[in-house]
């Protein structure tokens, strides 16, 4: 059975989006598939390309042939280079400007800021707890003094 990795078209007439699928080469474009391994939204800016790298590597390894369009997507994500053993396996996939957290440095800074905020919160909570315990001790000792005074 000849297996292809190709695009399955979904969406409206002028607003297409695609699923990256593994299918028998003899089936229809939007027909029965063996497995869906990703999605591609070309109308967004930048285009959304989400391919399960592990599954793509598996299907390429067992002999599935990508179409020209899917081959271009695999090159962008770096899966084709990884499969062929070529340099550049990290790919050239762009991310939105708002997704700055995707960079490792920004993510580390964000985690450090959250941890610092958590430490401040813990410190305030422990100070409140200590103050409450101290006031309870004072109230308890005052009550004990009153009890001793009333016994006499």
Curated annotation (Swiss-Prot):
Entry's Gene Ontology molecular function annotations:
structural constituent of ribosome
Which protein is depicted? Small ribosomal subunit protein bS16
Q: Does the keyword Iron-sulfur apply?
A: no
UniProt biased composition (Low complexity): 131-144
As for family, the record states: Belongs to the bacterial ribosomal protein bS16 family.
- Extent of Basic and acidic residues compositional bias: 118-130
Record GO cellular component, one term = small ribosomal subunit
Q: Which InterPro entries match?
A: Ribosomal_bS16 (IPR000307), Ribosomal_bS16_CS (IPR020592), Ribosomal_bS16_dom_sf (IPR023803)
Residue ranges, annotated region (Disordered): 118-152
Q: Which domain of life is it from?
A: Bacteria
Q: Mind listing the GO biological process terms from this record?
A: translation
| UniProt key word Mitochondrion | no
Keywords carried by this UniProt record: Ribonucleoprotein, Ribosomal protein
- Source organism of this protein record: Beutenbergia cavernae (strain ATCC BAA-8 / DSM 12333 / CCUG 43141 / JCM 11478 / NBRC 16432 / NCIMB 13614 / HKI 0122)
């Amino acid at each position: 059975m000849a297996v292809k990795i190709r695009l399955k078209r979904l969406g409206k007439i002028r607003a297409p989006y695609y699923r990256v699928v593994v299918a028998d080469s003899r089936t229809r474009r939007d027909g029965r598939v063996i497995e869906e391994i990703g999605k591609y939204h070309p109308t967004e800016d930048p285009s959304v390309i989400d391919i399960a790298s592990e599954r793509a590597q598996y299907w390429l390894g067992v002999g599935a042939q990508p179409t020209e369009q899917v081959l271009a997507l695999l090159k962008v994500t770096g899966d084709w280079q990884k499969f062929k053993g070529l340099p550049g396996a990290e790919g050239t996939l762009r991310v939105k400007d708002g997704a700055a957290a995707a960079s490792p440095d920004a993510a580390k800074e964000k985690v450090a800021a959250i941890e610092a905020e958590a430490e401040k919160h813990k410190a305030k909570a422990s100070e409140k707890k200590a103050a409450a315990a101290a006031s309870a001790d004072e109230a308890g000792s005052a009550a004990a003094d009153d009890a001793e005074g009333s016994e006499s």
